């Protein structure tokens, strides 16, 4: 695991709080409010990019990795500075292997995607998403450039969330010759590894989280290139007990990200007390995923105490030896002991 002995920061991710509704005002407020809770990093998730096609939903903009002036008219520099001025680090979301058909990139390079030219492709998220053909060296350069441009312009970006919300549903390369198409899966994976090695050669220290519609890429092969992985999009704490118990059979706790969501789970329509949410998320790398200003006074005070306590115990949680005592798969499903 890359940087496996380094303690992980407590962060706030914007996704479940505002989804695509990114604005300078909302990001400033979330940064300040999280700093007041003792947070250590703020991450701007999906929704910050797209010039011709601003990212207001899942149907557009992937591939156009320029800041949307309609959303962040002053760019992300003020947000980075604000985070630093509040004693925090800054992170940002990208999905560099993907493109939407409604994007400037697709308009310029429709031949860069995996699809057969004679058949309607299978689309991913938003019914316009396609997977870029990483076997094409020009696409490899593009994916590297997504990271390189961000880090060149904003070298003090500390953290990148690298997402991947579509599997290889269209198994045809417009770049490879016909006799090599049977090896597409292998060649694609080797091309991705080549890109990651290139990124790590230039940016060995930037923290990169690997996400794939949750934990779709949770595997050992990516560990040398990523410091952490998003365990699951399911943030309901009751379900997370089961998910994290299983994942901790194979992966260290400092590699698995676990976030405290809102009291009301959009996935299960269940109300969950804040203490239970923090207890479960503290089993791994603790984070939050909500609008902090929506906490009431009692919840806000509890969150401050829980974050402070996590900083005290995380050397044990993230670097200690794990002993399994009570499995949530035996008897009660909302209880485990580690």
Q: Which sequence ranges carry the predicted segments?
A:
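Carbohydrate-binding/catalytic loop surfaces
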Residues: 58-63, 117, 174-183, 327-337
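Generic recognition of flexible, low-complexity loop/linker segments
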Residues: 30-32, 79, 148-149, 196-198, ...
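Aromatic-lined carbohydrate-binding/catalytic grooves of carbohydrate-active enzymes
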Residues: 3-145, 154, 158-159
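Short, solvent-exposed polar/charged micro-motifs at secondary-structure junctions
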Residues: 21, 102-103, 219-220, 331-335
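Active-site neighborhood of glycoside hydrolase catalytic domains
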Residues: 68-75, 85, 107-275, 279, ...
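Structural signal for hydrophobic packing residues in well-ordered secondary-structure cores
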Residues: 1, 38, 310-314
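Glycan-recognition and catalytic regions of carbohydrate-active enzymes
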Residues: 289-338
């Amino acid at each position: 695991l890359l940087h496996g002995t380094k303690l992980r920061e407590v962060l706030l991710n914007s996704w479940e709080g505002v989804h695509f509704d990114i604005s300078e005002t909302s990001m400033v407020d979330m940064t300040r409010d999280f700093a007041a809770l003792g947070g250590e990093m703020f991450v701007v998730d999906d929704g910050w990019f797209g010039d011709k096609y601003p990212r207001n939903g899942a149907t557009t903009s992937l591939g156009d990795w320029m800041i949307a002036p309609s959303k962040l008219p002053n760019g992300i520099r003020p947000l980075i500075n604000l985070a630093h001025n509040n004693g925090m680090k800054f992170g940002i979301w990208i999905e560099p292997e993907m493109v939407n058909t409604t994007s400037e990139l697709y308009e310029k390079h429709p031949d860069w995607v995996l699809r057969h030219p004679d058949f309607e492709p299978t689309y991913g998220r938003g019914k316009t998403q396609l997977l870029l053909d990483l076997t094409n060296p020009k696409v490899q350069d593009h994916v590297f450039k997504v990271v390189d441009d961000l880090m060149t312009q904003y070298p003090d970006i500390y953290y990148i969330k690298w997402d991947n919300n579509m599997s290889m549903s269209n198994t045809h390369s417009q770049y490879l010759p016909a006799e090599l198409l049977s090896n597409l899966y292998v060649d694609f994976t080797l091309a991705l590894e080549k890109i990651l090695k290139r990124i790590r050669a230039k940016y060995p220290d930037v923290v990169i989280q690997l996400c794939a519609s949750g934990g779709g890429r949770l595997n050992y092969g990516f560990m040398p290139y990523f410091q952490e992985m998003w365990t699951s999009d399911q943030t309901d704490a009751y379900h997370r007990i089961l998910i994290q118990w299983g994942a901790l059979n194979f992966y260290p706790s400092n590699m698995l990200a676990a976030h405290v969501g809102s009291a009301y789970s959009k996935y299960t329509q269940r109300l969950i007390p804040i203490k239970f949410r923090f207890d479960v998320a503290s089993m791994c790398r603790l984070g939050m995923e909500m609008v902090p200003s929506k906490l009431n006074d009692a919840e806000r005070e509890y969150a401050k105490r829980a974050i402070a306590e996590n900083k005290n115990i995380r050397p044990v949680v993230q670097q200690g030896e794990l002993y399994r005592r009570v499995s949530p798969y035996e008897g009660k499903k909302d209880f485990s002991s580690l």
